Amino acid sequence: MNIKEFFCIFLPLLFLILFGKVYLSSFLLIYPGDIIFAFAISILTFRNSGVLLYIFIFFLGLLEGLDFLENEFIFGIYFVLIGIIWNHLKKYFSFESFELKISFWFFSILSFLIFRYVLLFYKLDVPVDWRLILNLAVKSFYYVCITFVWVLIFYKILNSFLSKTYEKV
């Protein structure tokens, strides 16, 4: 990721994403899934390393942590670790096929969901009931589906923007 891509593509998309998340959750009262995490995963699909990339991913983790029990720093570190793991796995697997990308996205979403629930149950001070677990299971299915749809949307948007930038060069 270079400065031009950051200011021309990623930063404006981040502002649109934050506006869309606020609009969907505040005005329409719809939980839009995890838009910020989906954006981070789709960025990691196209860019593998760089200091600016990891700073931006850490910042996205801080933004995500504001939504969930004030664990900003933990989520920032988790987002950077996902980036490091993705970069490390690119050495061993060829992520040229769309099926491998989908499997990594799905695995990342599920691992992030498990990470969120571990933090939730660690900070929870009430007894765990079967209705709570059933409610979390239903919300988890919705969460995975909607977040996966957002990943596909951001993948398509970033693919169109980044392929156009390389055609101009």
Enumerate the predicted regions with their spans.
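Terminal, non-globular segments
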Residues: 1-169
